[in-house]
Amino acid sequence: MTETDSQPIAENEQVKELLALLKDNNTPGYEEFSKLIEHVTGMEQRLLEATEELKAVRQEMQGLQNHSLKDALQKSYTAMEANISVMRHRLSELKSQIINGCRNILTDFRGRGAVALNGIKIGRAHV
């Protein structure tokens, strides 16, 4: 697990710096970027909740005596665990892309000044 995985995106230094920069310069992309960060934060929270619920299911399964029920639950548990793992990986990739985009914009801003903030688009190709 990398720092990107464990650290909430809203607490990332590059993200916080870019949000402040966009806000301070009244950049049109501020609202959209802020909403993106809020959305990713929500996904992080839901994934954390799903992981905690899965842990609780596992603990409850261990106490089951009915083997056929336990086997059925084990299959469901394994499928949910795999889905959560895939979601965690995708979220980690998304966070990395956002953070790298922030780094690139901040580097460009330091080199060119406020003009670097003109035309920032929030989407797959940019942040």
Please identify what each model-predicted range represents.
Residues L22-N26, C102, K121:
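Generic secondary-structure transition motif, activating predominantly at the C-termini of alpha-helices
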Residues T51, R58, Q62-Q65, A72-L73, ...:
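Coiled-coil heptad-register positions
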Residues A125-V127:
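Conserved small/polar residues in nucleotide/adenosyl-binding loops
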